[in-house]
């Protein structure tokens, strides 16, 4: 299911901090991440997570 257009895109908090830090320095840098948010409900449904 896709995310609603009414909502803003999801960005993890720790990645948002990195982006804001780079924006204040006016630097351009590649941020490599494998970040994925997992909700508690999904974790309860599938104990392997």
From Swiss-Prot:
Keywords for this protein: Chloroplast, Plastid, Ribonucleoprotein, Ribosomal protein, RNA-binding, rRNA-binding
Top-level taxon of origin: Eukaryota
Compartment list: Plastid, Chloroplast
Single GO term (MF): rRNA binding
GO BP, one annotated term: translation
InterPro entries: Ribosomal_uS19 (IPR002222), Ribosomal_uS19_SF (IPR023575)
Gene3D superfamilies: 30s Ribosomal Protein S19, Chain A (3.30.860.10)
Function: Protein S19 forms a complex with S13 that binds strongly to the 16S ribosomal RNA.
Similarity remark: Belongs to the universal ribosomal protein uS19 family.
Protein name as annotated: Small ribosomal subunit protein uS19c
Organism: Sinapis alba
Gene assigned in the entry: rps19
């Amino acid at each position: 299911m896709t995310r609603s257009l009414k909502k803003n895109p999801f960005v993890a908090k720790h990645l948002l901090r990195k982006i804001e830090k780079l924006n204040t320095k006016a630097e351009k840098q590649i941020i490599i991440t494998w970040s994925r948010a997992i909700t508690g409900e999904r974790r309860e449904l599938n104990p392997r997570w």
